[in-house]
Curated annotation (Swiss-Prot):
Protein family per UniProt: Belongs to the universal ribosomal protein uS8 family.
GO CC terms of this entry: ribonucleoprotein complex; ribosome
Name of the molecule in the record: Small ribosomal subunit protein uS8
GO biological process terms, semicolon-separated: translation
Top-rank taxon, per record: Bacteria
Record text on subunit structure and interactions: Part of the 30S ribosomal subunit. Contacts proteins S5 and S12.
Role this protein plays: One of the primary rRNA binding proteins, it binds directly to 16S rRNA central domain where it helps coordinate assembly of the platform of the 30S subunit.
Length: 130
């Protein structure tokens, strides 16, 4: 099975896992998915992630809940393969007035919108998390 948009698949698996109250979700591994998982973990949206398996590695993301409610209220893809969205550093969006994050792919790697602003770089808006 080939995925046309692996990041949209990652976001959908997280959304579906949290709506079903799953402890963790697994998916095929890629460097970009691991980078997104690192950003989500550093910002406190997921509990942890791990890469399992040698021959066919899978990324396992441990979902996070607070008082029985999912920590991630909204996670959505912005830039997609058919329509890439790029923004300069002064055009980077603030999600929910700064309460959420935008995941940005920059020349310095994947980071949040706040980190990209402070680093003085823009890039492709991967998605919004709130």
């Amino acid at each position: 099975m080939s995925l046309q948009d692996p990041i949209a698949d990652l976001f959908t698996r997280i959304r579906n896992g949290q709506s079903a109250k799953k402890v963790s979700v697994t998916m095929p591994n890629s460097k970009l998915k691991v980078a997104v998982a690192k950003v989500l973990k550093n910002e406190g949206y997921i509990a942890d992630f791990a890469i399992n398996g040698d021959v066919k590695p899978e990324l396992s993301i441990e979902l996070k809940y607070f008082e029985g409610k999912a920590v991630i209220e909204n996670i959505q893809r912005v830039s997609r393969p058919g329509l890439r969205i790029y923004k300069r550093r002064d055009e980077l969006p603030k999600v929910m007035g700064g309460l959420g994050i935008a995941i940005v792919s920059t020349s310095k790697g994947l980071m949040t919108d706040r980190a990209a602003r402070s680093a003085g770089v823009g890039g492709e808006i991967i998605g919004f998390v709130a």
